């Protein structure tokens, strides 16, 4: 994956340091509508593995991942194995119509939940787009962080390691995920400014 821009990487370093939910703890329940108005309650997926992907179509990192079909390929691989994939857009300026257009243009087969107030994003401590969270069948958060190590300057592999893929494979084998938390990279989540800012 090519380096997009130094400004984009700088945005990652300026991400707010919300604590959010802790790995190993219960994933907080929430209800959000998707781009078509269908409401999704996290607890309705209890008994299944859930992937939450914070996204923003205007972010160059997100755009590159969708050009490369990173997320869509993972969804296609695991959807028949009782894995639920939910994108979440916490950008304050996002409109459902924008999401529908983005989904149609990119062939996105899973819903994008609309969180313009940033309530759920802040609850989970989502800092970047993308920022990935994996929840096991018992409702426990087992991973949060980057989709892969493409921007890790210390990696020595020929290609990037996909952390979400590693976590899902381990969960489906009934094993403990080999990685629990990594530093996310991408654009900062464009939260609605607070009244005091």
Q: What residues fall within each predicted segment?
A:
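Thiol-/selenol-based redox modules, centered on thioredoxin-like
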Residues: 136-137, 141-197
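Boundary at the C-terminal end of the N-terminal hydrophobic targeting segment
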Residues: 17-21
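Short, internal strand/loop/helix patches
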Residues: 102-144
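A short beta-strand-turn-helix
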Residues: 30-50
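Positively charged n-region of N-terminal signal peptides that target proteins for export
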Residues: 1-4
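Short active-site neighborhood of thiol/selenol oxidoreductases, capturing the structured segment around
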Residues: 43-64, 85, 168
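Bacterial N-terminal signal peptides
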Residues: 6-16
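Structural microenvironment flanking redox-active thiols in thiol-disulfide oxidoreductases
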Residues: 63-106, 114-123
């Amino acid at each position: 994956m090519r380096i997009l821009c130094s400004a984009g990487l700088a945005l990652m370093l300026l991400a707010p340091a919300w604590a959010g939910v802790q790995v190993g703890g219960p994933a907080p329940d929430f209800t959000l509508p998707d781009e078509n108005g269908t409401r999704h309650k996290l607890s309705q997926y209890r008994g299944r593995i859930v992937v939450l992907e914070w996204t923003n179509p205007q972010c160059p990192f997100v755009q590159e991942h969708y050009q490369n079909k990173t997320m869509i390929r993972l969804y296609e691989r695991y959807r028949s194995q009782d894995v639920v994939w939910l994108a979440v857009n916490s950008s304050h300026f996002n409109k459902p119509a924008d999401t529908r257009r983005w989904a149609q243009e990119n062939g996105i087969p899973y819903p994008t939940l609309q969180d313009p107030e940033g309530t759920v994003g802040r609850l989970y401590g989502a800092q970047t787009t993308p920022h990935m969270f994996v929840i096991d069948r018992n409702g426990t958060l087992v991973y949060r962080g980057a989709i892969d190590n493409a921007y890790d300057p210390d990696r020595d592999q020929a290609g990037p390691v996909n952390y979400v893929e590693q976590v899902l494979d381990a969960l489906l084998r009934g094993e403990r995920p080999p990685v629990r938390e990594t530093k996310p990279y991408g654009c900062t989540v464009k939260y609605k400014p607070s009244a005091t800012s």
